[in-house]
Swiss-Prot record:
Subcellular location: Cell inner membrane
Species: Neisseria meningitidis serogroup C (strain 053442)
HAMAP family from the UniProt entry: Ser_Thr_transp_SstT
Topology class, membrane: Multi-pass membrane protein
Entry protein name: Serine/threonine transporter SstT
A GO cellular component entry from the record: plasma membrane
């Protein structure tokens, strides 16, 4: 018993990032050497992601409602500058992907469209309609189905009602609930090394590395665009806001948010991680409690890259020449589509036919491109989520630090 306690204390003294790195390395080894054991270890990953997904909707609802209920008149949440950054970042990602698609034209071997079972949206109107319907969804269903647009809407309304009509005791109870849920999130995050070990070992055991070799160039363009956004464009946007070296903040967000998101492959599951990081960075709670859940829904630079690169690849494969005006229009469509990706089953991949329609590509061919997306999804989806989620907290921090700098001046 004493040995067990001393072992846990020894593990506790090692930083969480190092524990995650150890879990990652061990997962690669187990998944490669013993696929059967790797698949069995996947249970740890499923439990970890399941716990994060379960607690995230409750956390967002309670935290946003508590923040609005406790909000003092005269204090501002400063959400507008962050939304502007989200839109600039998403459009920059789409434009970068268009340029990369022109400079590095990619031809792909189309997979069978039968691999895709869900129906894509018929147009941009359907995407926007889906978002608006999510806004007025039943609040219980919104929490149960992790509909963050609906959760945010009802939390804002309930919080405003409590602020104007609730007693001090009621508002304090809601605040205590928010603190309790945040504590539960901290407990779950402590299991991240074990969860990531399970996720990595099962992924390696299921897919190996050979399945991705046939799409190496397509993956190189996708990942190259995402790396360029994460390491060049986003730092430039952050520098524009804070007027100092952005890379310490960028690398902190990539390390403490992006790594989690890469392995969980879920922006929703990463919301508690981003909330904890925002608190650690000393950001304004009234701001990040709203902007981070909102970012998980509308800040989709990674999705814009996926939609654009695969649409451009489809055009090149069909022998279609893409002029600059059409490419610019594709960037705009990809930006709007990406912002609605969370409201579409299948996310960014099932918005590819919408982008392909700009080039007159048939739906049958477009769905074959979607099938290719699912084949490379083990890497594409992980990198996309890591970029999307780490950018949520990065832009929130940039806007908040800019506000603090302006106030100091």
């Amino acid at each position: 018993m004493a040995f067990g306690k001393s072992l846990f204390h020894a593990i506790g003294r090692v930083s969480l990032v190092r524990q995650i790195a150890a879990g990652l390395a061990l997962g690669i080894v187990i998944g490669s050497v013993s696929p059967q054991l790797g698949l069995a270890a996947g249970l740890f990953g499923s439990l970890f992601v399941g716990a994060l997904k379960a607690v995230a909707p409750v956390l967002v609802f309670i935290l946003v409602a508590a923040t609005i209920a406790q909000h003092q008149k005269g204090n501002k949440a400063h959400i507008r500058p962050i939304i502007v950054l989200y839109l600039i970042g998403t459009f920059s990602a789409a434009l970068t992907a268009v340029i990369a698609g022109m400079v590095f034209p990619t031809h792909i071997v189309l997979a069978g469209a039968g691999d895709v079972s869900a129906a894509p949206p018929s147009g941009i109107v359907e995407v926007l309609k889906s978002l608006l319907m999510n806004l007025v969804a039943n609040p219980i269903n919104a929490i149960a189905n992790a509909n963050y647009i609906g959760i945010l809407a009802w939390a804002l309304v309930l919080g405003a009602a409590l602020r104007n009509h609730g007693s001090d005791v009621t508002r304090q109870v809601v605040a205590d609930l928010a603190e309790a849920v945040s504590t539960v999130v901290k407990w779950i995050i402590r299991f991240a090394p074990l969860g990531i070990f399970g996720l990595v070992s099962s992924t390696i055991a299921e897919t190996g590395f050979g399945a991705l070799a046939g799409y190496a160039k397509l993956l190189a363009v996708l990942l190259g665009c995402m790396a360029f956004i994460a390491l060049v464009v986003n730092p430039a946007i952050v520098w524009w806001k804070i007027r100092r070296n952005p890379y310490p903040l960028v690398f902190t967000c990539l390390r403490e948010s992006g790594v989690y998101a890469f392995f969980t492959r879920s922006s929703a599951a990463n919301i508690p991680v981003n909330m904890a990081l925002a608190k650690k960075l000393g950001l304004h709670e009234d701001t990040y409690s709203i902007s981070i859940p909102l970012g998980a829904t509308v800040n989709m630079g990674g999705a814009a890259i996926t939609i654009t690169v695969l649409a451009m690849a489809a055009a090149h494969t069909q022998g279609i020449q893409v002029d600059f005006a059409t490419a610019l229009l594709l960037s705009l469509v990809a930006t709007v589509s990406a912002c609605g990706a969370s409201g579409v089953a299948g996310g960014s991949l099932l918005l590819i036919p919408l982008a392909c329609s700009l080039f007159g590509i048939s739906n049958d061919v477009a769905m074959q491109v979607v099938a290719v997306g699912f084949i490379i999804g083990v890497i594409q989806d992980s990198a996309e989520t890591a970029l999307n989620s780490s950018t949520d907290v990065l832009f929130t921090a940039a806007a908040d630090l800019c506000r603090q700098r302006n106030r100091a001046e």
